[in-house]
Every structure is written in C-alpha cells, then in structure tokens.
Amino acid sequence: MSPRVVVTGTDTGIGKTVFSAALVGALDGVYWKPVQAGLDEETDRDTVLRLSGLPAERMLPEAYRLNTPASPHLAAEIDGVTIDPAKLALPQHDRPLVVEGAGGLLTPLTRSVSYIDVIASWHAPVVLCARTTLGTINHSLLSIEALRARDIELLGIAFIGEAHAESENIIAAMGQVRRLGRLPHLASLTTDSLKAAFADAFNIGDFFKDATA
C-alpha cells in the first residue's frame, strides 16, 4: 500500500491547505479533501493545484462539495445533504496520498460524528498543524490529547507562522511529540517559494517513516 498521511490542525484558517500543498508536492503524491464546505471562492483543492506544482489529475475529487463556508454538518444541512461517514473511506492510489481535514479535530461532520471519528477509522498517521501565535500551546496540547485518546498515530507537529521558540519547544516537550518543522508565512506565495520554504524547514524523511523502514 502506498504511504498515506492525514493533515489536520488545531483550528481553521491556520494554513493546513498551504502546508498540504507543500507536502503533496514534495512527495509527488495525490491530494484529497474529503469534504469541501464553501464553493464561492477558490476551494482548497484549487489552492493545492495552484501551489503544489502537480497536474490536475493528482487532485482527487471531494466526496462532498457543500456550498456554504461553515462547519461541515451545518453546510450539509443547508444543502439538504447528510454526510455519510461510510463514503469517506480513504481512496486507494499507487502514489503517496495526502488527506486534508476540515477545521479542527472535533469539527462535526454530522450531529453525532466528528472529524476525529473518521480519522480514527482510517488508521493512517497524522500530522498536526499548529499556529505559533498566542493560544497555540493550549490548542495544540488539547489536540494531541484527543488524538492519543483515540490511539491515532501522530507523526509530529508542524508549526505555521513566525518563529516562537518557547511555544514550539513547550508543546513538543509537554506533548511528547516530534517537532517536524515550521513553515513561515511567505510574502510572495508561489509554487517555487513554497517548495523552497518547505525544503528548508522540513525533512521529508520524517513523513511516512514506517513506509520506508
């Protein structure tokens, strides 16, 4: 089976999509966003296509495309749709698969199912993306605890934003988690600038470590 990794985050709007674009590009893989909520502007799949440098056929179609930019459970209800977790099984592919979640781990997909419930069913390793700004310590440690409470493999934490060594170090130490690196905010966000920033900050060997053993 080809390597698979799930990219999740401590919150919405922290940079998971940009990180996913960098990761899938570095792995020369395929990208999948199971549930897209909000279609009026550039979707996350569109963003990854634009930034990853990969061809369009590497962007797998979403299982659900919902019109309203809201929590998936609410966006689905507005559209008159019920998200069926059984339809969110990981796709099989001969290339590395990068899966991007929506919002944070406990973001509801239905009135009774959260994203973390589906992630647990995938049995795939997770990368947790976190901000470096005020509040990230609590959010990060809570997310780490939630993953471990469900026996979800955590590859490590990827920080996004300006350097804040103390926050990054205390999260890694108290959470007993690998610090994978930090992706800075880029003044000019292009395929080339993102590729260079990711290569400078991360060791691709830290991802899919089991697959290369």
From Swiss-Prot:
Catalytic activity: (7R,8S)-7,8-diammoniononanoate + CO2 + ATP = (4R,5S)-dethiobiotin + ADP + phosphate + 3 H(+)
Protein encoded by which gene: bioD
Gene3D superfamilies assigned: P-loop containing nucleotide triphosphate hydrolases
Active site, UniProt feature: K33
Annotated function: Catalyzes a mechanistically unusual reaction, the ATP-dependent insertion of CO2 between the N7 and N8 nitrogen atoms of 7,8-diaminopelargonic acid (DAPA, also called 7,8-diammoniononanoate) to form a ureido ring.
Identification of the protein by name: ATP-dependent dethiobiotin synthetase BioD
Residues annotated as binding Mg(2+): T17, E100
Cofactor(s) named in the record: Mg(2+)
A biological process term (GO) from this entry: biotin biosynthetic process
Species per Swiss-Prot/TrEMBL record: Rhodopseudomonas palustris (strain BisA53)
Domain of life of the native organism: Bacteria
Lineage: Bacteria, Pseudomonadati, Pseudomonadota, Alphaproteobacteria, Hyphomicrobiales
CDD domains documented for this protein: DTBS
